[in-house]
Amino acid sequence: MSTTPATPKVGFVSLGCPKALVDSERILTQLRMEGYEVVPTYEDADVVVVNTCGFIDSAKAESLEVIGEAIKENGKVIVTGCMGVEEGSIRDVHPSVLSVTGPQQYEQVVNAVHEVVPPRQDHNPLIDLVPPQGVKLTPRHYAYLKISEGCNHSCSFCIIPSMRGKLVSRPVGEVLSEAERLVKAGVKEILVISQDTSAYGVDVKYKTDFWNGRPVKTRMLELCEALSSLGAWVRLHYVYPYPNVDDVIPLMAAGKILPYLDIPFQHASPKVLKSMKRPAFEDRTLARIKNWREQCPELVIRSTFIVGFPGETEEDFQYLLDWLTEAQLDRVGCFQYSPVEGAPANDLGLEEVPDDIKQERWDRFMAHQQAISTARLQLRIGKEIEVLIDEVEEQGSVGRSFFDAPEIDGNVFIDGDHGFKPGDKVRCRVVDADEYDMWAEPI
């Protein structure tokens, strides 16, 4: 009497940024193509894969905690991701992990799964089809599109280049074909991500590739122009403030891509920026922001900043607050500086900022920026916006406008039952707003 072999089951935990999420999607897509079932609990899995984050100490602590939970609940754990470059640190705490690999090592992770629980030999990929767009961990109506790996910068607070390597741009034809598959599968919003989006193509000297028989340069401008032809929202993230950012503003003004720029400025004080090894042209940056908004009045700028960097004085911090007042950024995140093992900032010999002062400056920063964000959203009241519906709840619908990237920005709330479903795009009028969110009514 023959029995059908059990379907191999994998548990998966993805930690960290959207770039890591895309790595997880690639691994899961390959496993699904080989017939593995992805299960939501540790208990039901034959093996658990943990995709870690290693950017800052708190992220490493979370990664180690999750690995420990998986070992306790399942016992068979494979570790990958950014913290995987510190295999010794992981094995010191969790010596029983089965394997440890760094980021982007998709094949090694899949092979490690094979060693624990081999794929079924009778699996027929033509019966259990994986969708053309692959396995996605985001809702069906939006997706992250990773255009490159690594980074050529050497910011003193960052260890990303040591974890993910130098810039390696994906062929633009491959990127555009993936985007096309996503849109055909129902994706309404494409979020372009990388470590350094504006450097796309630098490593290959902006070589010309082909998409649907059409020549396209491997460069941010040409990529955006091509993406705009697909009919989805296109949102740019992790844009380093190179001069070529100016080139995409006309596309935003023309409505071809969303008028939204995610630019991590990190600070404004020339002295602190120099210590960070970031561009220290804060006055020129203000002029550029002014010029961008003259060309595209609807432009939304999101940024992130670090307070309490070694050597930051009260004068430096006040300079940052004054700069924020001038810049009038729309969406802003802020982190208190946390030393990262292996980061060049540890060896600068600068005076550490005490934790209580870091906290006090963070509180002041957030209060200062909240007032700016509130005032800018108040300007939207009475205006028409297009809203992409993310969720439908009992009280109404929750969506986002071009102002809002998923997870990190605000929401648009629409009260009442209007028959909407996730992925719908709805014309609305803004009726109220606070420092982060807007309330709107369908038109």
From Swiss-Prot:
TRAM domain span: 378-443
A single GO molecular function term of this UniProt record: 4 iron, 4 sulfur cluster binding
Swiss-Prot/TrEMBL catalytic activity: L-aspartate(89)-[ribosomal protein uS12]-hydrogen + (sulfur carrier)-SH + AH2 + 2 S-adenosyl-L-methionine = 3-methylsulfanyl-L-aspartate(89)-[ribosomal protein uS12]-hydrogen + (sulfur carrier)-H + 5'-deoxyadenosine + L-methionine + A + S-adenosyl-L-homocysteine + 2 H(+)
Pfam families per the UniProt record, alphabetical: Radical_SAM (PF04055), TRAM_2 (PF18693), UPF0004 (PF00919)
Family under the similarity heading: Belongs to the methylthiotransferase family. RimO subfamily.
Primary role: Catalyzes the methylthiolation of an aspartic acid residue of ribosomal protein uS12.
Protein name: Ribosomal protein uS12 methylthiotransferase RimO
Species annotation: Pseudomonas putida (strain GB-1)
Annotated gene: rimO
